[in-house]
Amino acid sequence: MDLGGGVGVVMAAVDGGGGGELGGGGLLGSRLMKHGRGNAGDQEHEWRPPAKQARGGDASSAAAAVAAAAAVSEAVKVAAPFLLGASCSPGHGGEQMLSFSSSASSCSSGGGGAAVAAAAAAGGAMPLYYGTPASCSGLSSVSLSSSMQGAMARVRGPFTPSQWIELEHQALIYKYLAANSPVPHSLLIPIRRSLTSPYSPAYFGSSTLGWGSFQLGYSGSADPEPGRCRRTDGKKWRCSRDAVADQKYCERHMNRGRHRSRKHVEGQPGHAAKAMPAAVAAAAASATQPSAPAAHSGGAVAGLAINHQHQQMKNYAANTANPCSLQYSRDLANKHNESEQVQDSDSLSMLTSISTRNTGSLFPFSKQHNPFEVSNSRPDFGLVSPDSLMSSPHSSLENVNLLTSQSLNEQQSSVSLQHFVDWPRTPAQGALAWPDAEDMQAQRSQLSISAPMASSDLSSASTSPIHEKLMLSPLKLSREYSPIGLGFAANRDEVNQGEANWMPMFRDSLMGGPLGEVLTKNNNMEARNCLSESLNLLNDGWDSSSGFDSSPVGVLQKTTFGSVSSSTGSSPRLENHSVYDGNSNLRDDLGSVVVNHPSIRLV
């Protein structure tokens, strides 16, 4: 049976009652408005109350209405799965459906319960219904084509318009499921949209009550792709990489917002300091193994060196952090220097105490006993630093007094001043055979005043068989007259101590060389005055002519200064142009060499 035909039958039956009155004194019916016509002046299509009361004797019209209601109920049962109001049984007379359009005009139903059943059975053509009590009557009805806003405005209940629409939609789907019928695809599309987008306008009637984005429990911050990186990099599309666990971004975009000027972990000093003790401990462990193979011996030595260096670094850091330890170190250094000065003064006093001895006993050096074998271990031989010129002025004066005093008077033999002499070419030529002779030979340097001189150009006087003694020169005297060379090194075990306390007697007589001021053997006071005056020659710019014109003793007229920087290696020698005061013999001995030196200075 066609649904439209059934509705038409119901309308015809209701309208064919001859304007039947409603039995039992109750008003039920309402005339249906005729839609699709725009005649506003047509008054017969409007709602109006029934004009006549039902007459009790008109039984034939009531029987016809009951028959029509039975036919409509059969039609409704057939179309029940497709009607929203089919869940309402005909016996529940309190539900009146806003229904369908029809060409029939208004009607008045009669016969009480039959008309109510027919009207209830005819419901379901409209997806919106209202539950009203049975005593109510005279409700106006609108068709499907009427405005939805008007219908929603008349809703009075606990639901909002959007919730009511959603409820009707779910109830319709339930009817299809209850009738074992396939649910149309058009009913499922809005539900799918609601799962993906909470702002789907297809099933929002009115959002005036503010339900908005909270529909169905979805909020605007919900991520449609939870496992994907949310970084867009200022573009339209999101990053295609998967996000890190419990993070919003991938590994590439995790550190994108950090500052660029942060240093790397490898460059920080804290990590290097932490790694240093571990490396030192590993090296020390490898070095302290008792049975280390020979292949790993180099690693053990390196480990010991690293451990020693680390210990020095720790000590330096502790000393730097503790100012008291720094002060203590300075005190120790000062005490050490003072002890060296005391030892030097002691050695000088010993030299002064034996100054009455014969010079021959003081210098028992022969051709075989070369003093350079004893004291040539210092690599700075023949060189004088500026601080050595200024150091120990009193000791230099005492040394001069020693050599210019009675020792010079007692020495009768005179030795002419000749070229410089060289030390033995090989260690075997010396009488003192030291265990480390080769090492000493490697540390020697040639005799030089201001320019290097070849050893072949030196004098052959040391190798000459005529001379029994070594020729004395200022460079030799400045080197060999140490406490060891003066006979105090009887025990060879004391050589190292003597070298540590070495204070050369004439270390200040190197730069000037022999200047040619010769003294007589019996004029000791004049020699001292000559020394005090010749000390000022250093301030005269090493001018040889101006220094010797003003000789305090008046024994020298003019002394020529030898070629010191000659490349031929010839030693500066004295021109025998000096005139002596009461002596005819020229003495080029020890005294004439020692006292004439402009580099000694009194403070």
UniProtKB/Swiss-Prot annotation:
GO terms for cellular component: nucleus
Main subcellular location: nucleus
Origin superkingdom: Eukaryota
Start and end residues of each stretch annotated as Disordered: 34-58, 561-582
Feature: compositional bias, Low complexity: 561-571
Compartment(s): Nucleus
Stored Pfam families: QLQ, WRC
Motif (Bipartite nuclear localization signal) on chain: 228-238, 256-263
Keyword Hydrolase: no
Residues annotated as domain QLQ: 158-193
Residue ranges of every copy of the WRC domain listed in the record: 223-267
Biological process according to GO: developmental process; DNA-templated transcription; regulation of DNA-templated transcription
UniProt GO molecular function: ATP binding
RNA-binding keyword on record: no
Function: Transcription activator that plays a regulatory role in gibberellin-induced stem elongation.
Family in the record: Belongs to the GRF family.
PANTHER family in the record: GROWTH-REGULATING FACTOR 2, GROWTH-REGULATING FACTOR 5
Entry's free-text remark on domains: The QLQ domain and WRC domain may be involved in protein-protein interaction and DNA-binding, respectively.
Stated name of the protein: Growth-regulating factor 6
